[in-house]
Amino acid sequence: MILAVTVPEDYPDDLTRRVAISSSIYPDPHTHIETVTYGHAGDSMSTLYTLLVGDGTRVTRPLKLLGQIVRHPVKFAKTLWPQGWSRRTIIVLVMQTLDNAIALRPKLKRSGAVRLQTEQDPERPNPTFIPVANEAAEWLAKRTGGIAQSSLTEALINVPTTAHILGGAVIGHDSEDGVVDSCQRVFGYENLLVCDRAAIPANVGVNPSLTITALAEHAMSKIPAKDAQVNGASGSTAGRAGSRAS
């Protein structure tokens, strides 16, 4: 889930003069919050945010947003002005280790084109509101005199925004229960591997860059040298030049 806090124009510091992701906290055992900046050229990202909105449904959350606009018209007007937004904005990136999931389903459009559409897992739905996320944004806004913001999709249609869509290429024993094997090789295809976040089998709850790197290294370690022989499904080498078994 992604929220934002925009500090006042007279704030003394340029928030982009720092490492993009520099600090994080665990407000509870399942939740990890990072502060992020987009950099000087990220002003257009302001169109993805609006005033902070609380919990609700697809019906009540837009009404709550309307109420926020009526109560805070000046703050709302400021969120509509993109110039300098990125320099003055802290992104609040909220991640959890809870076992929830969404699915991507093909949907046929009237034009005949096919597009992918997300669908909630009925048994493990992805949360559309995380109380501690709003609390963190409100706390940061209070400390800086800034404006706390929800993502536009969250406020208007009760759909959260994520930076890390994980999974999709399931690790399995064979093509009946997975896409790739334990070495991340795609079943039924030669020399095709999945080395990105699609192969991550669980919700890691933190920025997954290092996990992706580790998986990629694992997959590469199973590829034999050009002059080696592949020994079974494990991808280990039977011998190398100058030391082959006779």
What are these regions (language model features)?
Residues 202-220:
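A conserved FAD-binding loop/helix module that cradles the flavin
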Residues 137-147, 216-230:
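Internal hydrophobic alpha-helix adjacent to the cofactor/substrate pocket in enzyme cavities
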Residues 13-17, 30-36, 101-108, 180-183, ...:
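Short conserved micro-motifs at the rims of enzyme active sites and ligand-binding pockets
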